[in-house]
Each structure stands twice: as structure tokens, then as C-alpha cells.
């Protein structure tokens, strides 16, 4: 009986996942994708119908359509892995490919696959990890958006995409760049205009814009943005999760560039245009925003930390974030409702103007009051809180950072004897701190991140 049952289970089970190989140096279009006969081009595999996937039965896409199988019998199926070996892959576009379960595209062990750009459009269930993406791999180096995940009005939406362990950069070393290069040559990093997209554990450097998320339910986690001349992160979609990212080194000020640079920026768009809608359910947790790791850099800008000026921002959680900046806007929300700003640390990069930075809750630009916002357990050089039912308690406004922190402005761990130790409210305090250490560690909860 057991043998018969096992036979039935094996017959009824799906085929095991297969690993395929792509090698632009040693591969061939005539290969079979095996380790000994790899294919030569990822784009050729995608374009030649070697992936069994799904797409819409016709275009233009209309809501309610049912996906149909395309490339039936192709060697690569949902659940398989494509391993990329060292070499140059050019511009890669994944389109018209809705998988029933994820297909993984990943760097082979020890390999360094290099792409000029990556576009994922009108697709589902792809995981891309371990790749280097830069226009500097091919001459001429031109200003582009290096990684895009996007819907398409004609071909259909994209969703359920994961990007991980990417190294995305305009140029590896930008030390010789001046204002013109930072504004006109620097490419932008990752632009996500699709639902349920994750970008994690990636490095984005020497860019114009870092990460832009306008799709809903996105997850931006544990990324480093280092060297940017516009905005570090833009969060425009609903229910976006931004946690444990580090954004540092904003360059080129208003003398050369009209963009008002932000570590994190959001705004709404409604029927009446910018500032007439809502962005809801966003979580900003454990992020670090540093204007300049070298305050003497002559190219450094004056960065707004978290700048949200065209609300309403509804049901937001802003907790355990660190902002080190040379600007008045440390955290500013113009039009906020039903939200929490808890256990954040905001400090001035230096003691000169502009600054010191504040935590601000303010009226919407149309005069409508912010309402029902909790501001608790924060450490900041200034506070400016206006609105209806704004609850503010257990906060410290400080001018002498050395009395609170180990080595300000960059090491904001609390020093022994700091007034912020064991002084916070337990109510509403996050269970972890910015280092993901459980709270409390002493007799009570600590203030700040």
C-alpha cells in the first residue's frame, strides 16, 4: 500500500525545479542551458521563447482578463533558476512574462554579471539577485534610469517582483565629478511603478535619484544609497514599507540644481493635482539619513531629511529613524492624519545655518489642519507641532548633543548618564530600536532611535 501511495504521489507531483546556465563568454545560442553547454545571452533566452510563461490573450490589456500560457513546452518553467556567469549582458528587458511561481535570475557562485540596464514590465513572479547594473559598462556612459519595474497601459501591469543584492551605480568612482556631471550625467537608480515589489539588500551609489516607489504595497529594505544629487528615496505609493535603509551624501546645492533635495520625500496626487490626494499606510522604520559623512566636502548640499509637503499623509508610522542634516526640515509633514512619529533622533550636522532641524507637523498647504498625530519619545534640536489632537509627550528638544549622545553627530547611541535613558513612555514605543535590539534594555524604555 505504501509503495502504491508513493507512486501516486510521484505521478501527481509537479516536475522538480531546474537550474540553467547563461555565460556570455563561453556560451552559445545553440546551447541547451546546461552547465557544460550554457546559453550565451539572457535576452536571447527571453526573446527566443525559451521560457514557458503566461501573458494576456490580446492587447490592450483590460481588467478582468485571464492569463494564458505562452511558449508551451519551452525548457524554462515557473520555479526554475537562471544562473548568470561573469560577463556583460547589456540591456535586459523582461516583458510579457507572468509566471505562476517565481523564476529566479541570479549570479552564479563567484560570478559578476554586468548589465547596462534592467527593465521589468508587464510581468509577474520574477526574482533578480546578485547583479551589477551600470551604464558605465558600455560607452558612451549616458544618463538613464538603470533599473525599472513598471506597469504598461497597453501590455498590462506588473506585480510580485523581488530585486535583491544589486549593485547599481552611474560610475564606480565619482570623485572627479563636478556639478555638471552630478546633475547631467548621473543616472537614477531604481524606479518602481508597480504593485508588490521588493527591493532589498542592494547598493545604489553615485546617482541622480536613488529609489522611487510609486506602486502600492512595496517593500524597500536594508539598502544603501551613497552619493546622490537629487532625492534619496521617494515614497508615493500606499502601504509602502521603508525600513533599515541608509541614505547618505547628498551633493550639489541650489546654485547648480533647482531640485530641493530630500533624504526621503513624499507627496500626494488627487483629482485636483499635486497635494489633493492621500498617501496612506506608509511605514518609515529604522532608516538613517545623513546629509554628508564628510561635512567639509565642497560639493555637499543642504538636504531636507524627511520632507512630506503636499499631503494628506494618513495612517503613517514613522519610528526609529535617524536624521543628520544641515537644514531646518529634519522631518516635516504638511497635512498629516491618524499617524505616529515615535522614537526618532534628529540632529544638526553642524552649528551653522541652515538649521537646526525640526520635527514638524503642520497644516496642509490649503490650510486644513493636521489631526490625530502622536509625537512621542523623540530627540530633536527643534519641534514645531500644529494641528488638532496632536499628542506630544516624552520628547527632548536639545542644543547640547554631547550631553545625550556618544559622539554626535554620527554616533547617536546614548551615552552613559544621558537624560534620554529609561525616560521614554512604554506606550507606543517600538519593540526594537534602530539597531534592532529589543526594548527595553534597562529599567525603562529609552528615548530616540
PLM features: what roles do these ranges have?
Residues 12-13:
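N-terminal signal peptide c-region/cleavage motif recognized by signal peptidases
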Residues 398-449:
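C-terminal accessory segments
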Residues 251, 260-265, 270-335:
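Beta-propeller domains
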Residues 93, 310-413:
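Predominantly extracellular beta-rich ligand-binding scaffolds that present long acidic/polar faces
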Residues 70, 88-95, 99-100, 118-121, ...:
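Right-handed parallel beta-helix
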Residues 43-46, 65-75, 90-98, 116-120, ...:
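Short, T/G/N/S-enriched strand-turn elements that build extracellular solenoid repeat scaffolds
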Residues 24-83, 446:
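Acidic Gly/Asp/Thr-rich repetitive segments characteristic of extracellular carbohydrate-active
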Residues 84, 105, 126-128, 158-163, ...:
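All-beta strand scaffolds that present successive hydrophobic residues in beta-strands
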